[in-house]
Swiss-Prot record:
GO cellular component assignments: exosporium
Superkingdom as given in the UniProt entry: Bacteria
Location of this chain's protein in the cell: Spore wall
The protein, known as: Exosporium protein A
Length: 308
């Protein structure tokens, strides 16, 4: 078996014996050699999964998505609102109930979880800029109504030295969450007149408060996984990694860099409507034809004058 690799835009064949198995992308021009073994590995296998998208607005859950900005009473004191950072997810509970649809292994899975994240807000107090970090905690309950999540048949017991044996649950529900703060809004509340449901308590700093309200978007993937043994083709153990690269002189690297683009790309509308390139080619052809006719006319005129 031969492999192809790209070098200076020329595809050359190499023998599979010269190929060193290593992690990397398999390009279209390449062809992997035969594996050296078929081995048995134990891995979590995904039996079913589904995606849930949620957009949480302050109007739907003001208590969790709005936080008071301390030490200020006027929205004009807010100078900058940072991005959401340090997003973490904690699963509080998981319940699985069989679904009466005649299909074995299908279950209704309900998950309660909490998403926490921080937002930095720069505020001006007495002419000095301070950074306030607001801690948000959003509790949600989601349901996958028909997830194929069969029970594991084999039971696994792990015995540890000097400790009692421990039974391991081979089936588990995994939650993967990607969160994004879609928008931020600064709201001022007069607790004496228009106390809303956003935890309007007036025990500190007078009767006016400023709140930061977040619109939160969540991509949630629910997976049912079971630890199983699979046979897979393999190329042996992973190779020994390369030595860690030493840090270089940052000034030397900087001096070797090219000057970056000083200005961002512009977005402007076209001054003229789009035209048909074929029409433009016809226009050029007609213009050349006219010029050729004029040249012929000049030649004829010159010949007549010369004969006279």
């Amino acid at each position: 078996m031969f492999l192809l690799y790209e070098k200076e835009d020329i595809y050359m064949a190499i023998n599979s014996k010269d190929f060193i198995p290593r992690p990397g992308f398999v390009n279209k021009q390449g062809c992997l050699p035969d594996p050296v073994e078929i081995t048995c590995i134990q891995v979590p296998k995904v039996f079913d999964q589904c995606l849930i998208k949620e957009c949480l607005k302050p109007t739907d859950d003001c208590e969790q998505l709005c936080k008071q900005i301390p030490n200020i009473t006027d929205p004009a004191q807010v100078r900058c609102v940072g991005c959401c950072k340090d997003l973490k997810v904690k699963v509080n509970s998981v319940t699985k109930c069989p679904v009466s649809n005649g299909k074995p292994g299908h279950k209704k899975v309900t998950i309660n979880f909490t998403v926490t994240f921080d937002v930095d807000v720069d505020v001006e107090i007495n002419g000095v800029i301070h950074t306030e970090t607001l801690n948000f905690s959003v509790n949600r309950t989601i349901t996958a109504s028909n997830l194929y999540c069969p029970d594991a048949i084999a039971k696994t017991i792990i015995g540890k030295e000097c400790t009692s044996a421990e039974e391991i649950d081979q089936q588990f529900i995994k939650l993967e969450v990607v969160g994004e703060c879609l928008s931020t809004d600064i709201s001022k509340i007069d607790c004496d007149n228009d106390c809303c449901s956003c935890s309007c308590t007036c025990e500190d700093n007078g009767d006016k408060k400023v709140f930061l309200c977040i619109t939160l978007g969540l991509f949630i993937i629910i997976k049912c996984e079971i630890v199983v043994q699979l046979m897979v083709p393999a190329y042996g153990y992973c190779p020994v990694p390369e030595e860690c690269k030493c840090s270089h002189d940052p000034c030397k690297e900087f001096m070797e860099r090219e000057l970056p683009t000083l200005y961002p790309p512009q977005e402007m509308d076209n001054l003229f409507d789009d035209y048909d390139e074929r029409q433009d080619e016809r226009h050029i052809h007609d213009r050349k034809h006219i010029e050729e006719e004029e040249e012929r006319g000049n030649l004829v005129t010159s010949s007549i004058i010369a004969s006279n």
